[in-house]
Amino acid sequence: GTMRGACALALLAGWLALGQAPRPPFSAAPQEGHEGREPRYRQLWLPLTQAPFRRLLAVFLCNGIASAIPAALMLFFAQDRLQATSPQIALFLVLYFVSGALSMPGWLRVVRRFGLERAWLAGMLLAVACFGWAAALQGGQVAAFAVICVLSGAALGADLAVPGALLALLIERSGAQGTNDGAYLGWWNLATKLNLALAAGATLPLLQWLGYLPGSQDPLALQRLAWIYALLPCALKLMAAWLLHRLLITSRNPPQGVTP
């Protein structure tokens, strides 16, 4: 029903946005003989020895954990803090993901004008504003939260469009394209899964320790839920924005392969 239609619409919007994405130039890397290759275990660890990749990965991890926390706690926040119904929660999800997909062409235009890093920074700051607003919501303010879902979904578009492009650019300029790009992608995918694991594995026990249990109506417990759902991601997003600005934008020696 509603959810299937929303997923189909989101996939269609994402496909249309992908069609507008710029294609990176293809460069055929020379194939080395077996005698010229490093051992496989060294190839696996090679990305972590590269300062540009470590810097980008640090920003990606901090930002990813900040984004994963609301995703892990959204159902509890909507049900217990906002007193939202199941259809309203379904609508929140529809608005969030459709907004994220539809915002990607706009973010691509921002990238063309201001660059990848500054576009990502703008997305982070938009997300901080959304989370700060969400922290102040009270029970019954579902319309305001729907607006937040649209805006935070738009911020999600930057997370979908920019980090992967930065990684692809880094791989290309480091000379690993076609030779060792699998190692870079492997560490990147591991970081993605680590973001989700840390968000759920840390925040749920923390909420229980703070006195919140699903279905709780205690005002203090619900206030603490709002803090963890919204203010903790704000702090992490601001830290990620600082790292992005410090390591990738204003560094005296911009890491080759990251800054276009």
What are these regions (language model features)?
Residues A84-L93, F145, L222-L225:
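Juxtamembrane helix-start elements in MFS-like secondary transporters
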Residues L102-R118:
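Helix-to-loop junctions at the C-terminal end of transmembrane segments
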Residues L61, A143-L160, L166:
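Hydrophobic core of transmembrane alpha-helices in multi-pass small-molecule transporters
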Residues S86-P87, S174-A191:
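Loop-to-transmembrane helix entry/capping segments in MFS-fold secondary transporters
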Residues F97-P105, A197:
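Residue-level signature of mid-helix packing/kink "hotspots" within the transmembrane helices
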Residues A6, L91-G100, T192, L232, ...:
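Transmembrane alpha-helical segments of major facilitator superfamily
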Residues G1-L75, Q79-D80, A84, Q223-P260:
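Intracellular loop-helix junctions on the cytosolic face of multi-pass helical membrane proteins
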